[in-house]
Swiss-Prot record:
The lineage of its organism: Eukaryota, Metazoa, Chordata, Craniata, Vertebrata. Residues 206-352, 399-426, 460-481, 559-594, 861-882 are annotated as: Disordered. The keyword Ligase does not apply. This is WD repeat-containing protein 44. It comes from Xenopus laevis (African clawed frog). Residues 563-575 have a biased composition (Low complexity).
């Protein structure tokens, strides 16, 4: 049924101003014209009748019946109509079904014609019907109003007579046309049968052809639909081709995002914070290429195996994941062209001196700009190539004087000089000089004897700078390994000291050529990986674990053969691999040195990188990742001698990290500003994201909260957090001081998570180490004392997270307590820790310093060897994870700019 709105639109439809009323014509001409128009526009009427609603047609038919009955009582019969009725009756009996359907399409035209004649001028269809009644203007003007009144009743009279005479053929029509009874059953109105008989007996196409041609219409226009004329019509669609393929199905609707979970009672209202869980961290899923989420339980954690690591391609590019970024393609194409030497305005190629003089770099501390050719004198000593590369890209550097300053008074003195306060500057310098003199005298008095001699020797080396050019000038040469090292503590820290009795037990110098940039222990604590400037990864193994890993290598049948790999230089290990399998656990070291925990010769060497190595990462099952300045990440395994896979990047790879729960994935941060989560078995980038900002340089990366979030550090001093499941942005921290020269963010060099306490340790190039609470992103503690202005030095925790260790550019190893021992201090600021302990055992910049994760394996070297002789300890293949653990002993390793690696053991005094 039609709605109320359709009915209102029908009666309230405005008249069409483009249609004009036509004068009336004679009944004969009117009938002839109507029949001709029905045949001409039969096809168009069929289309209109389909769209015509049944309810609207019923209302029109009812009005026609009522008016026709009134007129039939007063009007006489017309003989002309009777003759045509007989012809129509004889013709309709023999018509086909197709002709009947064509005749039914002309129903609205007769209906409109009759209703228009009766309703008069105010009928809204008057103007539309006038198009079909082509007038003779001259005759209508001569006839006048009397002619109009004579023709109109006669037309109505003829239609009524047709309906009465055609009742005879109703039964025959019902038998031939099954569609008409359906309409009658729906309407169930007996009065409508008359109109249906009229429509069924309309003239056929044969009769219309015999009629004389009518006058062509003045305006060719189809009869509009009554309801559609009041509505906005849609655009006309072109006809579909015959041999056209079927239309493409519509695309599936995009699924709606899942509803957000309501925050629980333990969630923090601060949007930038992290969720805090008392019972540890939830083992959430990690997005994989095959499934959206992969729920992993703590008991059954997936891990990487050799079969999946070695399957597929050996060289993986970052562009394999569906054109990850446009910038990658453009940068790669630009690198293929190669660097072009700059030229002068005349076209002459510039010399090296001219190029260096044209590049201006800015000192971040003083704001001074100097040519790059003069910057070598002011750069800090022991600067790494990564810092030099970043300096060329950012045109910024930090002077050597600023690197040695631990306080925030130096920039203030420069400001006072510009303001004319020279007296204040001299007073400050005098206080510094007197303070240092008193401090030196005090230390000399305390370190009487051997310590005083060591102090003089170290001052001599610093004056003549012999330690940086000649590694053999170490103070440890010819000295026993168990001698005490130089120790110092922060001013105002009165003790007791925890590392005052620390000793050097082994020196692994002589293997690395050049600086050692990174060192990492395996999860079990029996393997040490070191890498740096000589492009080689070296694996060191404990003496008591050598047989275990040697048997592992033999078990996998990799001794003496290599697997196929695209790069021949990455296949063969160094000769030390073959030699290492011949010697026993103690034949390769000095027999007098029983305290040395490591074998003096590396267990294996991995070659394949073509530039400095910057970072290392171990998995739980002895896979090793190495990142380099050659823009690649290589995958190794302790049982294999060849590179298992090579992951290519666009720029230097500064940081890598295995996922802590699923080591099939690893995170990589690059100087191209992109953070990538790699899928090792599928050999592709599973997820990636790009940082924003002026300097898009990622300098550190790691996982936190047991892999729930990934965090990166940037060159401009930001720590940006992403959820690992989709690698979407979560929040960020600006690592900087509120005042002083460190109010501008400096490069982040290291990020280490603190398990169990929902905190991270951040190292930056402002010579500060900060501990942040991830629950509210607040600063829990700031550690001062070390010098780290331009290096890639990073701090780390001890095995029980009670201490923090870091290298330094002033050749010391610095150690802090993670939290203050309030029994040692009467009044102390809880969020500042200036009470450090320093160890001097190197004569160059200490580039890396780490604690051993399982010190019990190294400390008890003497006791374990004695027990193995007497009690025949357990087989070497089954090594317990926490054997001989000592709660009061720490093992510390440090490496310097010259390639020296030293092992320290510290036994704390038992306090009863």
């Amino acid at each position: 049924m039609a709605s109320d709105s359709d009915t209102e639109e029908f009666f309230d439809a405005p008249e069409d101003v483009n249609l004009s009323c036509s004068p009336a014509v004679s009944p004969l001409k009117s009938e002839t014209f109507i029949l001709k128009e029905e045949a001409t526009y039969s096809k168009k009427a069929e289309t209109r009748n389909i769209e015509l609603k049944q309810d609207d047609s019923k209302e029109i038919i009812d009005s026609i019946i009522e008016e026709s009955q009134k007129c039939s009582d007063t009007e006489n019969e017309n003989p002309v109509v009777e003759e045509k009725t007989e012809v129509l009756h004889e013709t309709l009996i023999g018509d086909s079904v197709k002709t009947k359907q064509d005749l039914l399409s002309n129903i609205p035209e007769l209906v409109v014609t009759e209703s228009t004649f009766h309703d008069g001028v105010e009928d809204p269809l008057q103007q539309q019907i006038s198009e079909y009644l082509e007038p003779d203007i001259s005759r209508s003007q001569d006839a006048g109003p009397s002619a109009d009144s004579a023709y109109v009743p006669s037309a109505i009279e003829n239609i009524v007579d047709l309906t009465q005479d055609l009742k005879i053929t109703e039964e025959l029509k019902i038998a031939e046309e099954p569609e008409i009874p359906l309409i009658q059953e729906e309407t169930k109105d007996p009065s409508k049968n008359i109109v249906e008989d009229v429509f069924s007996k309309l003239p056929t196409s044969d009769i219309i052809e015999q009629l004389p041609p009518a006058k062509p219409p003045r305006q060719i226009c189809v009869e509009p639909d009554i309801v559609a004329s009041t509505k906005k019509s849609g655009p006309n669609r072109p006809p579909q081709p015959i041999n056209a393929p079927p239309p493409r199905p519509p695309p599936p609707a995009r699924p709606a995002p899942p509803p957000r979970k309501k925050k629980g009672d333990t969630d923090f209202d601060r949007s930038s914070g992290f969720e805090y869980q008392k019972d540890g961290f939830l083992a959430g899923g990690l997005l994989s290429p095959n499934t959206l989420t992969e729920n992993m339980n703590r008991d059954s954690q997936p891990s990487l195996d050799l079969a999946s690591a070695t399957s597929g391609e050996k060289i993986v590019t970052a562009q394999e994941n569906g054109k990850a970024a446009d910038g990658q393609l453009s940068s790669q194409s630009s690198e293929c062209l190669g660097p072009q030497r700059p030229r002068s305005n005349s076209g002459r190629e510039l010399t090296d001196d001219e190029i260096l003089a044209s590049v201006m770099i800015k000192n971040l501390d003083t704001g001074e700009e100097i040519p790059l050719s003069l910057a070598e004198e002011k750069l800090p000593t022991g600067i790494n190539p990564l810092t030099l590369y970043i300096m060329r890209r950012t045109k910024e550097y930090v002077s050597n004087d600023a690197a040695q300053s631990d306080d925030e008074e130096k920039p203030q003195s420069h400001q006072s000089e510009t303001d004319g306060g020279k007296l204040k500057q001299k007073t400050t310098q005098l206080k510094k000089f007197l303070g240092k003199s008193v401090k030196r005298a005090k230390h000399l008095a305390e370190e009487y004897g051997e310590r005083a001699v060591n102090k003089v020797k170290s001052v001599r080396d610093e004056v003549f700078h012999t330690d940086q050019d000649d590694p053999s000038s170490s103070d440890d040469e010819g000295m026993p390994y168990t001698r005490p090292v130089k120790f110092k503590a922060a001013h105002g820290f009165k003790g007791p000291y925890d590392f005052e009795q620390i000793k050097v037990v082994q020196d692994l110098s002589g293997e690395h050529v050049g600086a050692v940039w990174t060192m990492k222990f395996s999860h079990c604590g029996r393997l040490l990986a070191s890498a740096g400037q000589d492009n080689v990864v070296r694996i060191w193994v404990l003496k008591n674990a050598f047989d275990y890993f040697n048997n592992m290598r033999i078990k996998y049948n990799t001794e003496g053969r290599v697997s196929p790999s695209p790069s021949q230089e990455s296949l063969n290990s160094s000769k030390s691999d073959t030699d290492g399998g011949v010697f026993s656990g103690t034949d390769d070291v000095d027999p007098d040195d029983k305290n040395a925990p490591f074998r003096q010769v590396p267990f294996c060497k991995y070659k394949g990188h073509t530039a400095d190595l910057l970072d290392l990462s171990w998995s739980k099952n002895y896979f090793l990742l190495s990142s380099s300045m050659d823009k690649t990440v290589r995958l190794w395994h302790i049982s294999r001698r060849e590179c298992l896979c090579c992951f290519q990047h666009i720029d230097f790879v500064t940081a890598i990290a295995f996922h802590p729960r699923d080591d099939r994935y690893f995170l990589s941060g690059s100087l191209d500003g992109k953070l990538r989560l790699w899928n090792i078995p599928d050999k592709k980038v599973a997820l990636w994201n790009e940082i924003d900002g002026q300097t898009k340089l990622i300098t550190a990366a790691n996982f936190c909260q047991n892999g729930k979030h990934a965090v990166i550090g940037t060159y401009d001093g930001r720590c940006i957090f992403y959820d690992t499941e989709h690698l979407k942005y979560h929040t960020q921290i600006h690592v900087r001081s509120t005042r002083g020269r460190n109010r501008v963010g400096r490069k982040i060099t290291g990020i280490e998570p603190l398990p169990g306490e929902n905190k991270i340790l951040v190292t930056s190039n402002d010579s500060r180490i900060r501990l942040y609470d991830l629950r509210d992103l607040s600063l829990s503690m700031k550690y001062k004392g070390c010098v780290n202005s331009s290096s890639q030095i990073k701090a780390s925790f001890s095995h029980d997270f009670t201490y923090i260790v870091s290298g330094s550019e002033d050749k010391y190893v610095y150690i802090w307590s993670t939290y203050h021992d309030l029994s040692k201090f009467t009044s102390v600021r809880r969020d500042r820790n200036d009470f450090w302990e320093g160890i001097k055992a190197h004569n160059a910049v200490v580039t890396s310093a780490i604690f051993a994760p399982n010190p019990g394996l190294m400390v008890s070297a003497e006791t374990s060897s004695e027990k193995q002789e007497g009690d025949q300890a357990e087989p070497v293949e089954n090594i317990p994870s926490g054997a001989l653990k000592s709660d009061h002993t720490e093992v510390l390793l440090s490496a310097d700019f010259t390639g020296a690696i030293k092992v320290f053991i510290n036994k704390k005094k038992n306090i009863s």
